[in-house]
Amino acid sequence: MASRQSRQQHTTSAPAASRTQTETSTPSQEQPPQDPTPEVRSQPAILRLRGVRASSGPSVRWAEGVVDNEGLGRKSSKVCCIYHPTKPVGESSDESSSDSSSDSGTDSDDSTRGKGKRKHRSGGGGGGKKHGEGDCHGHNHGHDHGSSSSSGGGGGARKKKKKRTPSPNAYEKMPKVKPRAPAPEGAPGASGQ
């Protein structure tokens, strides 16, 4: 052996289930090279591992305009009852005129939908009834639809609108079924069945 090397080990402990070990080699005795070509030493490879960063907060951030429409003191991404904020009587609704069929405009229009299966409040405020008592959408999941006149849910404070033709909302629309065109004879996936 031309040179002897001693190895020292340094062990560093990290939290919980990770461990780092570093080896440092130092030559104890050095001899001059006998070859005219310099000796090529390879540096030991360094592997640095970094743990996953812990999330610093909630992954969902609600916009300022998101409303707690279930009255439970929390905001939710679950869509049960679509909330449309009330507008002052004189305010223009140009930006929402294109989607007027999806507005929850008047209570009387809603009562004509769904082949009479649903019962809706008619007229002004009234204490919010629980779902499943025959009003709203006919599903029971334990929250009030408080339609007091202060929240704008009542129909008595609204100006008379032109009655629109009833059209199903997004939850009532059935998807259009496209008829399948027969595949050409030589096309992949075409079979004689």
From Swiss-Prot:
Compositionally biased tracts (Basic and acidic residues): 130-146
Biased composition (Polar residues): 1-19
Alphabetized InterPro entries for the sequence: PPI_Ypi1
GO molecular function: protein phosphatase 1 binding; protein serine/threonine phosphatase inhibitor activity
Extent of Low complexity compositional bias: 20-32, 183-193
Chief location bin: nucleus
Keywords, alphabetical: Nucleus
GO cellular component: nucleus
Family: Belongs to the YPI1 family.
Function as written in the Swiss-Prot or TrEMBL entry: Regulator of type 1 phosphatases which maintains protein phosphatase activity under strict control.
Name of the protein in its database record: Type 1 phosphatases regulator YPI1
Protein's organism: Pyricularia oryzae (strain 70-15 / ATCC MYA-4617 / FGSC 8958) (Rice blast fungus)
Higher taxonomy: Eukaryota, Fungi, Dikarya, Ascomycota, Pezizomycotina
